[in-house]
Each structure stands twice: as C-alpha cells, then as structure tokens.
C-alpha cells in the first residue's frame, strides 16, 4: 500500500501579503518603500489640489497681513500658490491638532508644512523603491542614484533652507510665480549667481541638455535602416531585438571629424554613464550650494573691488549685480521692514546737530 502525504500550505496571511508587496510580477511594483510612498504622495497631492483651489489667505510674514494664494481668492494658475507656513510658527512642527481650530491652522499656513513634509518623504521612498526594484531584478543601483539629484534639490529648497533661515516661511512657495519670487529673493539675499556650486549646476543642466540633444540626434542620424524609403525608419525596430539599432562606428566617425577624434566616445557604456553623470553631479552641487547658503555662506561678493591709483571705484558687473540685489531686497517683505536687513543694520547718523 502506498501512502501519499501532502504538506499543508502553512503560509500565513502576512506571508502572502509580503509576497504580494515584493512581487516583481505585479503590473506596478509596490515594494516596502511603496507602502510608505503611496499614502504620503496621495496625501501631499490631495492637500495640494484642495489648498490651491480653496485655501484662505495666509499670514506668511507673521505681521497680520495675510497673502492669498488660492484660485477662489482671486488668483489664477500662474500667480496661484500654496503660501508657506507663517513666520509666527517658525520651524515648529505644526499639524492640525496643534492649532486651536482649523481656521487658525489655515491662517498660519499649516497646509504648506503638511504638503512639503509628506512630499519629501514620498519622493525619498520613490527613490528607495527604485533601488528595491533594481535589487530584486538583479540590476545595478544607478537609477536610484541618479534620482537622488532632484530629491536632494527638493530637500534643499523645502527643508534645509527653511531650517537654516529659521522658519518655514522662507521655503519656496508651491506655485509658478511663487517659485520665481523665491529665486529672486534668494539672489537678493545670497547672491547665488556668484556661487561656484550654482555655476556647476547651470553647467550640469544646460550641458546635460546639450549632450542629450547631441546624442539623440547622432543616434537618429545613424540608424541602421531596415525599411524601404517609403516607410518610417522607426518601423524597422522590434522591441527586444538583439541587433544594434544604430551604427555607433558611423556616429563616432562623424562626430570625431566634426570636432576632433577624442571628443567622441567609442564605448557605448561609458558614453551613457557620462550622459547620466554630468547633470546628476551638477544638480548635486546646486543642492549643496543651496544647503550652504541656507546658513548664509553666500556667493562671492566683489562689490567695489576694482579701484584706480587714486582709490576711486571702477564699477564692474559685480557692482551692478549688487545694486540689483539691494533693489530686489527692498521689494521683498516691504511691509515687514522698511529697508534691506544689511542696510538697516547700519546705525543711522544723528540729525540733532
């Protein structure tokens, strides 16, 4: 007689949940980072939409002069924004239950802090989810490393800068014109255009755009044609095909003759590493620059640095920039103080004779 023994499936509900969360067969990979990413990003997005449409004015400067940012309070898509949390709150953690009422929470700009903190946690988890999926598929981790650049930039403007300045009211408003206002005020107070890390960031972004356009145009111009002249060359590609889709030798020869031989990559892997690394490193430096300027380690100041033999100042473009900075700073928070802080710090001369 033969006995057949079946092992009972002892997998628990928790075990099935873990397998589902970490399965790479799902249409969208969730992962353990996704368990935190999904609710935080949904919260940030939902509150942003509601606040952008209907949030009441916020006392951003803490001087009882609220500024409206929502559509229902007179703004449009261009000038609307989520107004940063009030200077009266500073860096305090300000959830809804810390306010005496929801009206007070809205008046002090509570939605901004809620959105920003959930957003930063969400995008950090998205980066972790990229690493997690790469790990489970046996891929290298560089996708998450590249994504760390925009995560670092967002963290710098939404968290590190307010910490350095002592208040979430100094964070970047969540809107189009609010972003421009933040940039102008940042230039006025920190002279960011004269900071070397910002210069590296500009080189990274613009250089990355240039290299991306050059690479795309070279590849598109050196496709191996698999179709007739009457068909699109794109129809000659089949997803997953083993053959090369373009002639890298032809592209290398073209670019080497256009510039010089060693300006062109002859290794596809090192080429694509360069295309990824250039803008990523540039944005890393920009985020680092924002984080240092948050604590007032500002850009270079060459104000009145060129003088003639008689000691008279010979104005340079640096002096023009400094004059523009003062003008922008005067316009910033004009109701909170009458003069730029660096001018107001100078003791006024006596007028009593």
Curated annotation (Swiss-Prot):
Its EC number is 1.10.3.9. CDD domains: Photosystem-II_D1. The record marks 344-345 as: Cleavage. It holds the Pfam family Photo_RC. Tyr-161 forms a radical intermediate that is referred to as redox-active TyrZ, YZ or Y-Z. C-terminally processed by CTPA; processing is essential to allow assembly of the oxygen-evolving complex and thus photosynthetic growth. Fe cation binds at residues 215, 272. It is found in: Plastid, Chloroplast thylakoid membrane. The modification Phosphothreonine is found at residue 2. The record marks 190 as: Stabilizes free radical intermediate. A quinone binds at residues 215, 264-265. This is Photosystem II protein D1. The chain crosses the membrane at residues 29-46, 118-133, 142-156, 197-218, 274-288. InterPro entries: D1/D2, Photo_II_D1/D2_sf, Photo_RC_L/M, Photo_RC_L/M_CS, PSII_D1. Residues 345-353 form a propeptide. NCBIfam families: psbA. The D1/D2 heterodimer binds P680, chlorophylls that are the primary electron donor of PSII, and subsequent electron acceptors. It shares a non-heme iron and each subunit binds pheophytin, quinone, additional chlorophylls, carotenoids and lipids. D1 provides most of the ligands for the Mn4-Ca-O5 cluster of the oxygen-evolving complex (OEC). There is also a Cl(-1) ion associated with D1 and D2, which is required for oxygen evolution. The PSII complex binds additional chlorophylls, carotenoids and specific lipids.
């Amino acid at each position: 007689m033969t006995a057949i023994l079946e092992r009972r499936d002892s997998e628990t509900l928790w075990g099935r949940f873990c397998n589902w969360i970490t399965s790479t067969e799902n249409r969208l990979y969730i992962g353990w980072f996704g368990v935190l990413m999904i609710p935080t990003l949904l919260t940030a997005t939902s509150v942003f939409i509601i606040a952008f449409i209907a949030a009441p004015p916020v006392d951003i400067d803490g001087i009882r002069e609220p500024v409206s940012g929502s559509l229902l309070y007179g703004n449009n898509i261009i000038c609307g924004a989520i107004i940063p949390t009030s200077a009266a709150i500073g860096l305090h953690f300000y959830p809804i239950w810390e306010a005496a009422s929801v009206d007070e929470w809205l008046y002090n700009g509570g939605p901004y802090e809620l959105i920003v903190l959930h957003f930063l946690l969400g995008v950090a988890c998205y980066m972790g989810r990229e690493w997690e999926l790469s790990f489970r598929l046996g891929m290298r981790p560089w996708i998450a490393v590249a994504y760390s650049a925009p995560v670092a930039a967002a963290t710098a403007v939404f968290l590190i800068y307010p910490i350095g300045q002592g208040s979430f009211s100094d964070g970047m408003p969540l809107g189009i014109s609010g972003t421009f206002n933040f940039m102008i005020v940042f230039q006025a107070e920190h002279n960011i255009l004269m900071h070397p890390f910002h210069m590296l960031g500009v080189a990274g972004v613009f250089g990355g755009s240039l290299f991306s356009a050059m690479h795309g145009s070279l590849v598109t111009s050196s496709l191996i044609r698999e179709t007739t002249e009457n068909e699109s060359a794109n129809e000659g590609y089949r997803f997953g095909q083993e053959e090369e889709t373009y002639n890298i030798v032809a592209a290398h020869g073209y670019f080497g003759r256009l510039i010089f031989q060693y300006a062109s990559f002859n290794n596809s892997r090192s080429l694509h590493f360069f295309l990824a690394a250039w803008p990523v490193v540039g944005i890393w430096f920009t985020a680092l620059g924002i984080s240092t300027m948050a604590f007032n380690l500002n850009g270079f100041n060459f104000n009145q640095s060129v003088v003639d033999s008689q000691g008279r100042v010979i104005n340079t473009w640096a002096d023009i920039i400094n004059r523009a900075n003062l003008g922008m700073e005067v316009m910033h928070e004009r109701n909170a103080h009458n003069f730029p802080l660096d001018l107001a710090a100078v003791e006024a001369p006596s007028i009593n004779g």
